[in-house]
A protein has these predicted regions:
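HhH-family (HhH-GPD) DNA N-glycosylase catalytic core used in base-excision repair
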Residues: 1-201
Length: 201
């Protein structure tokens, strides 16, 4: 697909402006294709933790999440007991929601069951976009959907596999963040740079 015309004014996606942490995340991470199983698992857990809150809240707490959730290693999280859950729910450095903490543990167990047969988590997730990022051509934030048929399919498959906090809207936000779709506006320099540097088909 064509890039924005050379005369088109270029500026970052409006949602990242006015908050330094958002801007750094937008410029360095959001929309960059992720293929690493552990990184994808981490992102899925954090997207679920964000439900009903702002992503800024999660970004502010992400480093602490990584510390108390053992680097988001599924094998470790799957073994969490009630004492660990109680410690997490008493920790102001994370989002203290019992259902979300329980979902992280359940999702770790579902991750292990899903990958036990040899399929990678990455391959399982990327199948919903045919293994390659979808490069969209949005000109305004208003045009970007909250969910798509691809996120609907991912959500249904994850739920069948036992995952929690994986509704279609959460899955689409996950797909945007993990680079399964390039939803930077065409007026954003990252739209073309991600395409160039990560070899979209």
């Amino acid at each position: 697909m064509a890039d924005a015309p050379s005369h088109f004014p270029m500026h970052p996606c409006p949602w990242c402006e006015g908050f330094a942490l958002y801007r750094a995340y937008h410029d360095q991470e959001w929309g960059v294709p992720l293929r690493d199983d552990r990184a994808l698992f981490e992102l899925l857990i954090l997207e679920g933790a964000q439900a009903g809150l702002s992503w800024a809240t999660v970004l502010k707490k992400r480093a602490h999440y990584r510390e108390v959730f053992d680097g988001f290693v599924p094998e470790r999280i799957a073994r969490y007991d009630e004492a660990k859950v109680a410690a997490l729910l008493a920790d102001p450095g994370i989002i203290r929601n019992r259902a979300k903490v329980a979902a992280a543990i359940q999702n770790a167990r579902s991750f292990l069951a899903l990958t036990a047969g040899g399929q990678t988590f990455s391959d399982f997730l990327w199948q919903f976009v045919g293994g390659q990022p979808i490069r969209n051509q949005w000109t305004s934030l208003a045009g970007i959907p909250a969910k798509t048929p691809e996120s609907d399919a991912m959500s249904k498959a994850l739920k069948r596999a036992g995952f929690k906090f994986v509704g279609s809207t959460i899955c689409y936000a996950f797909m945007q963040a993990s680079g399964m779709v390039n939803d930077h506006l065409v007026s954003c320099p990252r739209h073309s740079s991600i395409h160039t540097n990560f070899h979209f088909s």
